[in-house]
Amino acid sequence: MRAFATNVCTGPVDVLINNAGVSGLWCALGDVDYADMARTFTINALGPLRVTSAMLPGLRQGALRRVAHVTSRMGSLAANTDGGAYAYRMSKAALNMAVRSMSTDLRPEGFVTVLLHPGWVQTDMGGPDATLPAPDSVRGMLRVIDGLNPEHSGRFFDYQGTEVPW
């Protein structure tokens, strides 16, 4: 990642969207696959932190200084009424906490750092019952990003701009 940031992204970066993620195995309590959980955590929680850290020089040169992290409502403590999905939920909750800390650390430099829930999107990960076409989710998240201001930093929104409880 540092090589990419150093050799490819050599100029200003106005907006960074961290959107990589995996669902991990959905195991019942007592059947958790800890190797899969570690992999899921590495991708979903540590990956965005690594990318953002590597991109900071370019972001600091940018005019907008916006960083959006695609997370999930499933990483919300307040919204967890179903249980299960330990790897995914824990990794997204960890990402959410990292972004909250990041927003505090970067706010003095004029950064706006947010979390975005894309909705239940029609992708391989969303599965056959997902209700939201990917282009609609993307359009919505881009509208949210475009409307960000400093008061939004550290907050969690869905693709329609509605704040998600933590």
From Swiss-Prot:
Which UniProt keywords are present, listed alphabetically? Cell outer membrane, Fruiting body, Membrane, Secreted, Sporulation, Stress response
Where is this chain primarily localised? Answer: secreted
Q: What is the protein named?
A: C-signal
- Activity: how regulated: Synthesized as a precursor protein (p25), which is cleaved after secretion to generate the mature active C-signal (p17). The p25 precursor purified from M.xanthus cells does not display C-signal activity.
Q: Check the record and name the InterPro entries matching this protein.
A: NAD(P)-bd_dom_sf, SDR_enzymes, SDR_fam
Disrupted-gene phenotype: Mutants fail to form proper multicellular aggregates, to differentiate from rod-shaped cells to environmentally resistant spores and to express development-specific genes.
Expression induction = Expression increases throughout development, reaching its peak during sporulation. Transcription is inhibited by excess nutrients and stimulated by peptidoglycan components and the B signal. The csgA upstream region appears to process information concerning the levels of nutrients, peptidoglycan components and the B signal. In the absence of nutrients, a region extending 400 bp upstream from the start site is necessary for development and maximal expression. In the presence of low levels of nutrients, a region extending approximately 930 bp upstream is essential for the same tasks.
Q: Which Pfam families match?
A: adh_short
Please give the GO cellular component terms listed in this UniProt entry: cell outer membrane; extracellular region
Instruction: Sum up the protein's function in the record's words.
Output: Cell-cell signaling protein required for fruiting body formation, a multicellular developmental program that is induced in response to starvation. Necessary for rippling, cellular aggregation, spore differentiation and for gene expression that is initiated after 6 hours of starvation. In starving cells, the C-signal directly induces aggregation and sporulation, which are induced at distinct threshold levels of C-signaling. Contact with C-signaling induces cells to glide with high speed and low stop and reversal frequencies toward aggregation centers.
What is a GO molecular function of this protein?
oxidoreductase activity, acting on the CH-OH group of donors, NAD or NADP as acceptor
Q: Tell me where on the tree of life, at the top rank, the source sits.
A: Bacteria
Entry's localization field? Secreted; Cell outer membrane
**Any transmembrane segments, and where?**
none
Question: What more is known?
Answer: Overproduction of the CsgA protein has dramatic effects on the developmental program: the rippling stage is bypassed, aggregation occurs prematurely and results in the formation of many small fruiting bodies, sporulation occurs prematurely, C-signal-dependent gene expression is induced prematurely, and aggregation and sporulation are uncoupled. Reduced synthesis of the CsgA protein causes delayed aggregation, reduced sporulation and the formation of large fruiting bodies.
Q: Which organism is it from?
A: Myxococcus xanthus
Q: How is it modified after translation?
A: The mature C-signal (p17) is derived from the precursor sequence (p25) by proteolytic cleavage. The subtilisin-like protease PopC is directly responsible for cleavage of p25 to p17. The cleavage site is probably located between amino acid residues 60 and 68 in p25.
GO biological process terms held by the UniProt record: sporulation resulting in formation of a cellular spore
Task: Identify the CDD domains for this entry.
Answer: carb_red_sniffer_like_SDR_c
